């Protein structure tokens, strides 16, 4: 059952074609990763799904969509608790406090609830950003290179944390990254975006839960090479 359906999607900016005639589907609870070079249209695709940009074509997405941006999209003048509470104004005070408490626990930051973003590490700030998106109980979560600015150790920890959350909550996730290893490790499917259109699709068959050790397997490295070649293929 498709939770996201895109048909013949095109996006233009002042005469520039950012996406051209793109088709896409994601099943309910599926984790789909999209890889592509800078300027290939990855972020534009997410923005179209979230209806942040004008487009032509057909997009069917549930109304309740959460988004985690490429750069830390948290309010620096709000504490961790206040950031998670943002947008929950229609809830009762008691319900809002319950949601915030649950998502601080989910983010493993209960002891940092009164800290401001400047007092937290990059990984902690990104956990707050994800917890805030999840606090609204979205059916679909769009993630735009959320770990691109993190060091390798923190990124690996965040990948495992995200998989733990996905396993528990089974949200439909569309995850954009330039990191092929990250895409293979996280996703059920990896799509390659090149020259403003999808040029490759790879089913990831590694059993879940996944462990870092799969990154050293022959199958993993074969997939990585195939995706790399697709990513760097040019039509002459």
Question: Which residues fall in each region the model found?
Answer:
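Conserved ABC ATPase "signature" region
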Residues: 94-112, 164
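Conserved signature/switch motifs of ABC ATPase nucleotide-binding domains
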Residues: 115-118, 136
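Hydrophobic anchor residue at the start of the ABC signature
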Residues: 130
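Short coil-to-helix segment of the ABC ATPase nucleotide-binding domain corresponding to the Q-loop/switch region
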Residues: 78-85
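Helix-to-loop junction immediately C-terminal to a conserved catalytic motif
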Residues: 50
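Catalytic Walker B motif of ABC-type/P-loop ATPase nucleotide-binding domains
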Residues: 141-144
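The feature captures the beta-strand-to-loop junction immediately N-terminal to the Walker
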Residues: 35-37
């Amino acid at each position: 059952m498709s939770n996201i359906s895109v048909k013949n999607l095109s996006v233009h900016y002042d005469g520039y074609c950012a996406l051209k005639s793109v088709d896409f589907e994601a099943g309910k609870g599926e984790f789909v990763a999209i890889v592509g070079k800078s300027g290939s249209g990855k972020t534009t695709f997410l923005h179209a799904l979230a209806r942040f940009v004008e487009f032509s074509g057909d997009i069917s997405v549930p109304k309740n969509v959460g988004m985690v941006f490429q750069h830390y999209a948290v309010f620096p003048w709000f504490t961790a608790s206040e950031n998670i509470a943002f947008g929950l104004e229609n809830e009762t005070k008691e319900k809002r406090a319950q949601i915030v408490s649950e998502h601080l626990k989910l983010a493993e930051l209960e002891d940092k609830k009164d800290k401001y973003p400047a007092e937290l590490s990059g990984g902690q700030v990104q956990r707050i950003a994800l917890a805030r998106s999840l606090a609204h109980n979205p059916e679909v979560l769009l993630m735009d290179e959320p770990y691109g600015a993190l060091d390798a150790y923190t990124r690996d920890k965040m990948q495992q944390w995200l998989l733990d959350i996905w396993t528990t909550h089974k949200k439909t996730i569309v995850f954009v990254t330039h990191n092929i290893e990250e895409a293979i490790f996280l996703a059920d499917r990896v799509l390659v975006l090149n020259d403003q259109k999808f040029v490759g699709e790879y089913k990831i068959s590694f059993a879940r839960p996944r462990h870092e050790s799969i990154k050293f397997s022959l199958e993993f490295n074969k997939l990585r090479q195939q995706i790399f070649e697709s990513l760097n293929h040019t039509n002459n």
